[in-house]
Amino acid sequence: AVRSGYDMDIIPSDLATYGKDAKALLKELQRDMDTAILLITHNLGVVWEMCDKVMVMYAGNTVEFTDTKTLYSNPRHPYTWGLLDSMPKLSDESKGELKTIPGTPPDLRLTGKCCNFYNRCPYVTEACTQSVPPLVEVEPGHFVACHRQNLTNKLEKGEGLKDE
């Protein structure tokens, strides 16, 4: 039905079926209709295979937005690091245990007044508990919402702040 008459600018999908057939069908529809796919998923492997650009969201807020290659090679938000670190790896010696992000998700009824990730973030500051960080372009086409990005230092994964 989609191919035979609907004019869509975006095809929304949660990719409930992760099989090759679902991915192939979405790619075919995208090509045939010259349109975009809005893919909503927690499966970062699917993101790598299917997406040109990625918007990472946490508790309803965008925390990072960039092209897929940059996200995987230079993630800049602590939540993104946690997501990428939680992906199973062939070289992983965790003996089947997946890494997790410490802490608990926020109460969504109380969001909007601070960074939603502050209680799970190893780099939390007082600013994080006082206001929602703005989405800032930290490199051309790479946007991050983190109070630590507003400093003159570059936040490095797992190493704290480094002087530029």
Annotate each PLM feature.
Residues 67-164:
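Charged, flexible cofactor/metal-binding loops and thiol motifs
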Residues 23, 27-96:
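P-loop NTP-binding/switch modules centered on Walker-like glycine-rich loops
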Residues 1-31, 36:
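Glycoside hydrolase catalytic-domain context in secreted enzymes
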Residues 7, 47, 105:
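Gly/Ser/Thr-rich beta-alpha loop segments that engage phosphate groups in nucleotides
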